[in-house]
């Protein structure tokens, strides 16, 4: 996966949408007006911590802006592993026009790659990282994907029925990468995965396994989902699992 990653220090991107390469006059502004406004929400307090990372997936150079100030604005090993798997198995997974929701989308790499591969993507995360997430998604998908990804707030375990009603929110895939680490919301994370899974939904979860809590979560995941280990990356300690909800 090293060939997909290059890190370079960059100044904060602060130009207008056209200066930053977002769009030309042919784009319908009203379609993306609120999205463009939302990119202003993310402003690192320490500009020295600001970086760009460059990736190559789906035949396109992808530029991700990050800040090390927030766990959710950094690309982690599970994300690159999941992107590689999606790219290598696009036809097998039937990603063209597939409906995908990503939990904990972070800096947006997985959602961007999924969109470039033809999927209809909903990228979700906590409110404090949505501005950066939206920025990266627009920067890398506008005018070059069939379906412009949607960015939405999702707090694990909260207001799920109200925000994502099962009657209208049906997904072929729920994606998650490096969402399991040392935090206190693992039960809510699992409950969210279960809630978003309907008959036919496949969960693809990639994670670097570091702590005992990671394996404890895996045990609970296996209780809720029929689980298959799809890939293991020894150099990064990342495991990629496929889960299909067990129905009583």
From Swiss-Prot:
Presence of keyword Methyltransferase: yes
Residues given in the record as S-adenosyl-L-methionine binding sites: 76, 104-106, 125, 156
GO biological process, one term: cellular response to dexamethasone stimulus
Record flagged with keyword Nucleus: yes
One annotated Gene Ontology cellular component of this protein: protein-containing complex
Pfam name, any one: Methyltransf_16
Keywords of the record: Cytoplasm, Methyltransferase, Nucleus, S-adenosyl-L-methionine, Transferase
Disulfide bonds: none
Subcellular location(s) per record: Nucleus; Cytoplasm
Class of this enzyme: transferase
GO molecular function, one term: heat shock protein binding
Catalysed conversion reaction: L-lysyl-[protein] + S-adenosyl-L-methionine = N(6)-methyl-L-lysyl-[protein] + S-adenosyl-L-homocysteine + H(+); N(6)-methyl-L-lysyl-[protein] + S-adenosyl-L-methionine = N(6),N(6)-dimethyl-L-lysyl-[protein] + S-adenosyl-L-homocysteine + H(+); N(6),N(6)-dimethyl-L-lysyl-[protein] + S-adenosyl-L-methionine = N(6),N(6),N(6)-trimethyl-L-lysyl-[protein] + S-adenosyl-L-homocysteine + H(+)
UniProt-listed Enzyme Commission number(s): 2.1.1.-
Tissue specificity as recorded in UniProt: Specifically expressed in skeletal muscle.
Family membership noted in the UniProt record: Belongs to the methyltransferase superfamily. METTL21 family.
Subunit structure, interactors included: Interacts with members of the heat shock protein 70 families; these proteins may possibly be methylation substrates for the enzyme.
Functional summary from the UniProt entry: Protein-lysine N-methyltransferase using S-adenosyl-L-methionine as methyl donor. Mono-di and trimethylates 'Lys-943' of AARS1.
Protein name per its UniProtKB record: Protein-lysine methyltransferase METTL21C
